[in-house]
Amino acid sequence: MADDGRAKEPQEQETPGEGHNKPKYIWPRWMHKRTFVRALEGTYSNLQQGLLDQPRVFHSTDYEWEGGPQSYGKPMINPMRTEVAQSIETHFHVFGPKGHNKKHGHMNSAVFYVLEGHGHDIHDGERYDYEAGDCLLVPNGVVHQHFNDSDDEQMLVLIMKAKPLFLFMHMLFQKSATMPPDEPVPGHEDFAPPSDL
C-alpha cells in the first residue's frame, strides 16, 4: 500500500528473480531470419533417367572368354559395363577336364553357383567338394583355388561378388599365391570354352 492508501502498481524488476520469475530469454540466433536450406539444383534427374535407360539384359555371347589353357573367365556385369549395378561383379568361369586356376586371395567374399560338372576348392588348406546345383561361399581374405575333378567334362560356374564395393571402401588387397597354369592338361590340349555361352 502507498502512503496515501492506494494500491501500488507492480513495477518490473531490473534483475530477474530466481526460478520461474526469470523472464523468457530469446536466443539471438532465433531472432535473425535465415535460410537453412537453399534451393537445390542439379542433374540428378538426368542421372536417374540415364540409369533407367541402361540395358537390363546382357547376352553372354556378346563377350569374349579370357585366359586359358586350363580355365577361362568371361566378365559379364561390372561397373565398367553398366552404371546400374555399381556394387556387384558377375562372371562365368569354365574349367577344362582336370583343369584348375591360380591359387589366390582377395578381400571380398564370393559366391560360386556351379552350373555344370563337379569339383572342389581348397580354402586355407581345407577341401570343399561341390557339384552342379551347389553354391560355394568363399569368405573374405581366404587363400583359395578351384579344381575340376572330372576326367572328361568341363565344369562351369557363375561367380558373384561385391568386389566393386570393397574397392570403393579401399579394401584393395588381392594377391596370387601361384600363377595360373600355362600348359594344358595332358590329353586335353584341345579344350576350349563353350561358344554358345
Model regions and ranges:
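Conserved short histidine dyad/triad with adjacent acidic residue
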Residues: 73-78, 89-105
